[in-house]
């Protein structure tokens, strides 16, 4: 059962990596369009963006009955939705992000988190919410997070990626996309879609839409191909400093992967018997300049074990606009009177206990 849920979660996460992309000419194949998308993304220096994420999880009755707290957490997750919007530019490094967590049910609660980040600092506006009973003196102020101070306190380096680092990560994203998409058969997983059939919102201007889809029929070859390309993918991920992977950990992962390969057929047999893919696809819409305008992800898996069935569902969307234009920001760096330092907030919390 653990193998089934772990592998299903892995598939879910890998599909999530497809929430980025771009394209080029209409003559290109669908796979070529997605591979070129990451190459084009290295050219992005500024943009507006927005998106949303919604989970839908259903655990077997026996799991919920054994642990009532699990049912409470599950209910909260299923009644919650995350949405976000923001603006970003590389040079000078500046990003603003407006996060909203909406929890519905008997009572609707919305938590809003405005965030502003520059190269060496970040400010988060402290919300007034029953989920976080914070001191009254801190409500409405901006919590200042100085990356150098946090690094000293934690003993680990904490930084906001510089423009050069962000461009490096964009390049790595392109290389990872080439490896990932290149591992899969063109006709089995990729297709061009119309804007209407793909469910792209009306306000998205797009010339091309590409769909990447997993089904019960192509799931086995997907995992088999993934096993082949995973070592190279891990090498690329290890190049990202923030991933924190040492060479020893990379080699250990590769060894474990190789050792588990002998059990792969049996694991896939078990999955094919116990997992149903109702839907697992991502659609990427590309604008006239070859940049991603919209990406949508939808996953719905049913997993059965010992006569009980659970569900894993995820809907996500990401949209960007005003790419490489002169973008306007809504937030400004807060004045000293509006700021509370991290240590000050900790002191207020401890004093109030």
Language-model segments: what does each one mean?
Residues 18-21:
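C-terminal motif of bacterial Sec signal peptides marking the signal peptidase cleavage site
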Residues 23-353:
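Subset-of-secretome marker
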Residues 1-9:
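Bacterial N-terminal signal peptides that target proteins for export
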């Amino acid at each position: 059962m653990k193998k089934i849920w772990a592998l299903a979660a892995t598939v879910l996460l890998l599909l999530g990596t497809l929430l980025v992309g771009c394209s080029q000419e209409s003559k290109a194949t669908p796979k070529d369009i997605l591979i070129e998308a990451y190459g084009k993304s290295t050219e992005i220096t500024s943009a507006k963006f927005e998106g949303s994420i919604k989970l839908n999880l259903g655990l077997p009755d026996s799991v919920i009955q054994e642990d009532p707290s699990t049912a409470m957490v599950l209910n909260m997750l299923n009644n919650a939705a995350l949405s976000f919007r923001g603006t970003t530019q590389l040079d000078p490094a500046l990003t603003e992000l407006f996060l909203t967590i909406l929890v519905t049910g008997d009572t609707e609660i919305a938590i809003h988190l405005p965030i502003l980040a520059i190269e060496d600092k970040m400010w988060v506006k402290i919300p007034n919410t029953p989920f976080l009973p914070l001191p009254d003196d801190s409500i409405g102020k901006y919590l200042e997070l100085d990356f150098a101070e946090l690094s000293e306190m934690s003993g680990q380096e904490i930084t906001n990626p510089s423009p050069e680092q962000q461009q490096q990560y964009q390049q790595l994203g392109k290389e990872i996309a080439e490896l990932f998409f290149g591992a899969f058969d063109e006709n089995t997983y990729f297709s061009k879609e119309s804007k209407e059939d793909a469910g792209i919102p009306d306000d998205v201007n797009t010339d091309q839409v590409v769909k990447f889809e997993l089904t019960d029929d192509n799931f086995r070859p997907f995992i088999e191909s993934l096993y082949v390309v995973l070592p190279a993918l891990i090498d690329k991920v290890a190049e990202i400093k923030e991933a924190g992977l040492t060479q020893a950990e990379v080699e250990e992962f590769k060894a474990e992967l190789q050792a588990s390969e002998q059990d792969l057929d049996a694991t896939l047999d078990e999955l094919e018997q116990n997992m149903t893919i109702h839907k697992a696809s991502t659609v990427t819409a590309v604008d006239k300049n070859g940049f991603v305008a919209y990406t949508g992800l939808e996953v719905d898996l049913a997993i059965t074990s010992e006569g009980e069935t659970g569900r894993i569902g995820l809907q996500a969307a990401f949209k960007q606009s005003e790419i490489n234009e002169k973008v306007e920001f809504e937030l400004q760096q807060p004045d000293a009177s509006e700021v509370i330092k991290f240590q000050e907030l900790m002191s207020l919390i401890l004093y109030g206990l």
